[in-house]
Amino acid sequence: MTKYALVGDVGGTNARLALCDIASGEISQAKTYSGLDYPSLEAVIRVYLEEHKVEVKDGCIAIACPITGDWVAMTNHTWAFSIAEMKKNLGFSHLEIINDFTAVSMAIPMLKKEHLIQFGGAEPVEGKPIAVYGAGTGLGVAHLVHVDKRWVSLPGEGGHVDFAPNSEEEAIILEILRAEIGHVSAERVLSGPGLVNLYRAIVKADNRLPENLKPKDITERALADSCTDCRRALSLFCVIMGRFGGNLALTLGTFGGVYIAGGIVPRFLEFFKASGFRAAFEDKGRFKEYVHDIPVYLIVHDNPGLLGSGAHLRQTLGHIL
């Protein structure tokens, strides 16, 4: 068996590739490529392997789209391919293609304390289910369970469940967005574009015209306290993140913890800490006590997708995580 495997984390814009030490799981030699510069994922992989001159026979790539069979067509990119054909072309013994949040969930057993920031709750209960979700371009969701000394990721498209308002303000937001776009999923309010939707709905609810703002603009104005509407939007985003996380905790009894990934929350960490997130997480009526001790963690590891891709592959090859 070769010492290293190829791991990757591919989104709509960039492909990040690295080497994973098969014995230890350590990630090294990470490099990011612009997906727009290459005709296919296979082409990017060939460039990476040529640059690093390392013998690789196994690989695992996490991709931001549903993986339901051999044919993979990326949601936010033109790349499409057969897993079996790419494996053959590259001469690999193993090639795993997994959902990006499957990879993030598989990273959790590999994370150290310095990779996590806790938001309330007690200690996680060993062996109990885990939930992970995160807002970025969209809203990713996965669960993780431990069965017979193996970690099993339960992927899905939980970001597309219905947005479930639980206050008068949230109900007004739903009404405005539904009139605009029809079905309002959780992702429509818990993502970069979702933050814009919240801002626009807040302004329109007051019979005013919203500015043409980007997520970055809203966050910056909220943190500078220079725009009341932006601050309300960001506050509401945090609250809805809490409600959604609490729903995940209830659904599978995730006493192993609820983990937040994605690139949005770290941009306003102090604001998030002071927000109504945890109160909303526990705002479950008769089941408030049920979720009270469930810890929530923000993942601050630089490359959880690469780490989790490596963990998934190593477990597939027979290693115990």
UniProtKB/Swiss-Prot annotation:
Q: What is its EC number?
A: 2.7.1.2
Q: Which GO terms describe its molecular function?
A: ATP binding; D-glucose binding; glucokinase activity
Q: Provide the top EC class.
A: transferase
Q: Where in the cell is it found?
A: Cytoplasm
Question: Where mainly found?
Answer: cytoplasm
Residues recorded as binding ATP, renumbered to this chain, are 8-13
Organism the protein comes from = Shigella sonnei (strain Ss046)
What PANTHER family does the entry give? GLUCOKINASE
List GO BP terms, alphabetically: glycolytic process
GO CC terms of this entry: cytosol
Keyword annotations of the record: ATP-binding, Cytoplasm, Glycolysis, Kinase, Nucleotide-binding, Transferase
UniProt protein name:
Glucokinase
Q: Is this entry keyworded Kinase?
A: yes
Under catalytic activity, the entry for this protein gives: D-glucose + ATP = D-glucose 6-phosphate + ADP + H(+)
Write down the InterPro entries for this protein, in alphabetical order: ATPase_NBD, Bacterial_glucokinase, Glucokinase
Q: Is the keyword DNA-binding assigned to this protein?
A: no
